[in-house]
A protein has these predicted regions:
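Extracellular/periplasmic carbohydrate-active domains that bind, remodel
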Residues: 1-184
Length: 184
């Protein structure tokens, strides 16, 4: 259990995973995250090394500013990522919400509830390479079972909205994942 914690880093601010074994029963609340690559990262391996299962994780009451990505879920080696709940999360971010599983049936039970992600200016020129790295859609998800978005809002002004190919690209997922996208 982690609570009432400010974090700042140039890498992922809160990373769950990377290594061997199983990580389970993580509880984190009332976090303030500043200036990192990802606000929250769930990662089963790093560049093909390691294999960690991630299960039963809950984040609540999180604020993040200046992060590239509010949430990244990356499964690349067949390990399981299950039963992750993120609720009451507010982020000012430059990149997309990215949740991608390389293998079908390894990532399941992902819930984002009462989350607001506001897109802010990036310090990088929007070249094709930068667009591919940061994501071409505001929300990207693939190969996730039981993906649930409840009151998820992604806010973007008209000028920034032109820098994206679209609001959402969700492929090979099951669940309830409608969300509100707004131009402000």
């Amino acid at each position: 259990t982690i609570t009432n914690c400010p974090l700042a880093s140039s890498a992922c601010l809160f990373r769950v995973g990377v290594g061997q074994g199983t990580i389970r029963h993580v509880r984190a609340s009332n976090l303030t995250l500043e200036r990192g690559e990802a606000g929250m990262c769930f990662q089963t391996d790093f560049d093909g090394h390691g294999r960690v299962n991630i299960e039963d994780v809950n984040f609540s009451g999180v604020s993040a500013y200046g992060v590239s990505y509010p949430v990244i879920i990356w499964e690349g080696n067949g390990a399981n990522v299950r039963d992750i709940t993120i609720e009451n999360y507010r982020a000012w971010c430059m990149g997309s919400l990215r949740m991608n599983a390389a293998h079908r049936d390894t990532v399941s039970g992902i819930t984002l509830r009462n989350c607001d992600f506001r897109i802010i200016d990036s310090p990088f020129e929007m070249t094709e390479n930068v667009k591919n790295m940061r994501g071409r859609y505001l929300c990207e998800a693939s190969n996730i079972n039981e993906l649930i978005f409840e009151n998820l809002r992604i806010l973007c002004d008209e000028e920034r909205a032109k820098l994206w190919d679209g609001g959402a690209r969700i492929m090979n997922c099951t669940g309830k994942y409608g969300f509100e996208g707004e131009t402000i």
